[in-house]
Amino acid sequence: MYFPIVALIGRYQDTGLDAPLTALAQMLTQAGRRVLVEAETARNAGVSGYPVADWDEIGRTATLAVVMGGDGTVLGAARHLAPYGVPLIGINHGRLGFITDIPLQDAHDALGRVLEGNYQAEDRMLLQGGVWRGEQQMYSASAVNDVVLNRAGRGGMIEVRVELDGAFMYTQRADGLIIATPTGSTAYSLSANGPILHPGMNAMVLVPVAPQTLSNRPIVIPDSGVLNMTLTAMGRVEIGASVHFDMQTWSDLQPGDRITVQRAPHTIRFVHPEGYSFFSTLRRKLHWNLMPQATDNLE
């Protein structure tokens, strides 16, 4: 039997998930699977009648996690479950949905095919980041999409000295600096004019946000390297800066703080129905197939 124990995870603040999650749980039970419901999902979405489990129990027990929500919901679940090796499948109940690639209306059919063994699996890298103040590590977190250094809301540009494996790259003055995985290359990085990286690539991309010097362009680096970024005390950095991990966890920064980013030791496995294509997702989400049309009311 494929995936005998399935965990259900939903977007916490979405009160409209009760019916679709309950229907999904019933479908899984009828298919002979044991269903677990993540604790916060059960509490906030109102799903009842099934065993409730915390993240640790899901990680130790589940053979598949079904995540219903937007990409942000999947990112949070992935960070929790990656160390356990539990594969994820995403059902889109959000907006764009690059990694929640199954539309809600197709969820039962798609999941049924997956349970029959008709699926594709892919492993994607994560980033591991740390904040150092002198020799003391102040903060550590992982990220599926990106690690982002940002100026404070009313502050000036930040200045960051960037090194890769001890070799000096540049000193960057900008509103921010994005370090993205291939998965994250279609998120914040893309909106800052970063390149799209195929998820099978072993790489990271550095993308400046509104750099002072226009010649400071995105650069792709191997994922085997260790990035060291030091926030300098020049300019108006003292007003405030922070580092964000998938825009869900963060740490405030001070001048002189050092941020390290490298590939995490574990990966996250995504499960897709048979026939999934990364390029098909790009065509749908980015409307690559839409051609400009002539109109009669051109201005």
UniProtKB/Swiss-Prot annotation:
Keyword list, A-Z: ATP-binding, Cytoplasm, Kinase, NAD, NADP, Nucleotide-binding, Transferase
Binding site for NAD(+): 71-72, 145-146, 173, 175, 186-191, 210, 248
EC number(s) stated in the UniProt entry for this protein: 2.7.1.23
Catalytic activity: NAD(+) + ATP = ADP + NADP(+) + H(+)
Gene3D superfamilies the UniProt entry points to: Probable inorganic polyphosphate/atp-NAD kinase, domain 1, Probable inorganic polyphosphate/atp-NAD kinase, domain 2
GO aspect biological process, one term: NAD metabolic process
GO cellular component, one term: cytoplasm
UniProt cofactor(s): a divalent metal cation
Compartment annotation: Cytoplasm
Enzyme class: transferase
Any Pfam family: NAD_kinase
Entry-linked InterPro entries: ATP-NAD_kinase_N, ATP-NAD_kinase_PpnK-typ_C, NAD/diacylglycerol_kinase_sf, NADK
Keyword set includes Magnesium: no
Entry annotation: catalytic residues: 71 (proton acceptor)
Domain of life: Bacteria
Single GO MF annotation: ATP binding
Family note: Belongs to the NAD kinase family.
Its biological purpose: Involved in the regulation of the intracellular balance of NAD and NADP, and is a key enzyme in the biosynthesis of NADP. Catalyzes specifically the phosphorylation on 2'-hydroxyl of the adenosine moiety of NAD to yield NADP.
Identification of the protein by name: NAD kinase
Taxonomic lineage of the native organism: Bacteria, Pseudomonadati, Pseudomonadota, Betaproteobacteria, Burkholderiales
